[in-house]
Amino acid sequence: MGNCCGNPSSATNQSKQGKPKNKNNPFYSNEYATTDRSGAGFKLSVLKDPTGHDISLQYDLGREVGRGEFGITYLCTDKETGEKYACKSISKKKLRTAVDIEDVRREVEIMKHMPKHPNVVSLKDSFEDDDAVHIVMELCEGGELFDRIVARGHYTERAAAAVMKTIVEVVQICHKQGVMHRDLKPENFLFANKKETSALKAIDFGLSVFFKPGEQFNEIVGSPYYMAPEVLRRNYGPEIDVWSAGVILYILLCGVPPFWAETEQGVAQAIIRSVIDFKRDPWPRVSDSAKDLVRKMLEPDPKKRLTAAQVLEHTWILNAKKAPNVSLGETVKARLKQFSVMNKLKKRALRVIAEHLSVEEAAGIKEAFEMMDVNKRGKINLEELKYGLQKAGQQIADTDLQILMEATDVDGDGTLNYSEFVAVSVHLKKMANDEHLHKAFNFFDQNQSGYIEIDELREALNDELDNTSSEEVIAAIMQDVDTDKDGRISYEEFVAMMKAGTDWRKASRQYSRERFNSLSLKLMRDGSLQLEGET
């Protein structure tokens, strides 16, 4: 459910402005009033067994340290002990579908269920009032995994082995507890503090689920680069976490993802083909043992893929302290930096898009549903959807509409209820035009010159960067995005950056789910999802 921990740069910026005022609960306002579909107020209950109702009795909320699709994370202080924690406050107004509500509920249940572990962020308390859910957890202020690697002067295979051992130990403890993570990626690992010996911690269980041995899942979730082929085939189990860890290992060793393309469909097809490139620099210098582990973690057949326990027994991990201590080269560090930096800029832009759409998406959806639901059954069929969209001036091909209907019809009854219709509406709004990208661009282009200049970039990313490397990072972004080298970023260059590699549409998790469901159906129909040897 987004970054639960602090960005250390925020603390630096705040200290310049004086001591922040504590706020008991930022969600007590009309802006967050919750209404049902008829417009009347009602109390939505999200958590099964919260610690309490009023967080302000036990904690003081301080400055904002992070922001995600659904919530804002604050530094918070235990009034009794003075201990510092992170508090993720999720507005109920943002939880528009049953899926959103279930995600939050399950995230808290999983965090409660997980045993204390040095590499897993721990839950302290949870609160629920009429307007929001508040999740109080361990505070991590040591920064992101890739940022620390880049900051170190010497990056080696031995360092990568130590990181991978930690990540796979997290996977192992999750699987032992009957939890499938489903969203392992570098951004979901933070260091507890700035010390060199700081523990690396898994921070986000927003897409995680409980599973039983042999149980298979079909919901497409996660981030495109890290998705296992069986996720796209919509038939998977906990083996997907080992695949995702294998993708991270590949990136740790060479600085780029193993399966990359300009479009989401291209990424999906590269994942299905599962061809691993060991020719580019620095792979010729990487040990055979490391390459062997990468191959076995990125085995396309989940039955043949190593388990987390088997990864930890692999010679490269067992002998992590003896792994080559020779630098992997400046190229790998530069790639990792670029990967991390571009994620920061995209995250900032996605946040602008998400904040804009959060208001826009809700407008008119209820009225549109009621207009299409002519029989007042509380659900609409394909013909009603098609007729309603045509009436609204949306011309969608029958085949695309059928795919969209199948992707969003969660209960499989051939109709869409209101919750499912919300997902369709969000999907269609984002497909219709690039208005949201224009709005994000305009957010950065503060003087409305038609270009993002270096000062505007610096201002927009102020909260994302620490003072020690900010100028270097800004220069790196400009170098990558400014393709015509005129010292500024045009709208066309901005759009190209947003659409490359990761899908900008992930501004909405619900949309991302439906988008990849739709893509999966297309790939099934054209035969792309068949395993080798299948007919």
Swiss-Prot record:
Positions bound to Ca(2+) 4: 482, 484, 486, 488, 493
- In this chain, the stretch annotated as Disordered covers 1-29
For this protein, the Enzyme Commission number is 2.7.11.1
- Segments carrying the region annotation (Autoinhibitory domain) are 323-353
Sequence positions that bind ATP: 65-73, 88
Kindly indicate whether the keyword Kinase belongs to this entry: yes
How is the protein's activity regulated, according to its record?
Activated by calcium. Autophosphorylation may play an important role in the regulation of the kinase activity.
**Sorted alphabetically, which SMART domains does this protein's record hold?**
EFh (SM00054), S_TKc (SM00220)
Q: Quote the record's binding site residues for Ca(2+) 2.
A: 409, 411, 413, 415, 420
Active site: residue positions: 183 (proton acceptor)
List, alphabetically, the CDD domains matched: EFh, STKc_CAMK
Question: What keywords were assigned to this record?
Answer: ATP-binding, Calcium, Cell membrane, Kinase, Lipoprotein, Membrane, Metal-binding, Myristate, Nucleotide-binding, Phosphoprotein, Repeat, Serine/threonine-protein kinase, Transferase
Location(s), subcellular: Cell membrane
Quote the entry's note on domains: There are 3 contiguous domains conserved in the CDPK subfamily: a kinase domain, an autoinhibitory (junction) domain and a calmodulin-like domain. The autoinhibitory domain (323-353) inactivates kinase activity under calcium-free conditions.
Protein family membership: Belongs to the protein kinase superfamily. Ser/Thr protein kinase family. CDPK subfamily.
Protein name, entry field: Calcium-dependent protein kinase 7
- From which source organism is this entry? Arabidopsis thaliana
